A protein has these predicted regions:
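GIY-YIG nuclease catalytic motif and its immediate N-terminal context
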Residues: 1-74, 79-81
Length: 81
């Protein structure tokens, strides 16, 4: 099973980071109001970054790393992917 760390851009230009086994399905869930509370309040969202990782634990670690980054770094990550 594949695991992914992803980042979406919210309607308020903020970035939300999470992990999933299916990034496309997860973005649809966010946009349908079945995602995280933050994205329900600041949707719709657009997928801007996806990174495949080894397993669930690696996904959690990478998610935490990305969440610690500043907004400018997240903007650069989104622009490159």
């Amino acid at each position: 099973m594949a695991f992914f760390c992803y980042m979406v851009k919210c309607a308020n230009d903020a970035y939300y980071t999470g992990w999933t086994t299916d990034p496309i399905r997860r973005v649809k869930e966010h946009n349908a109001g079945r995602g995280a509370r933050y994205t329900r309040m600041h949707g719709p969202v657009e997928l801007v970054y996806v990174e495949e990782v080894e397993d669930h634990i690696a996904a959690l670690k990478r998610e935490a790393e990305i969440k610690k980054l500043g907004h400018a770094r997240k903007v650069r990550m989104a622009a490159v992917s």
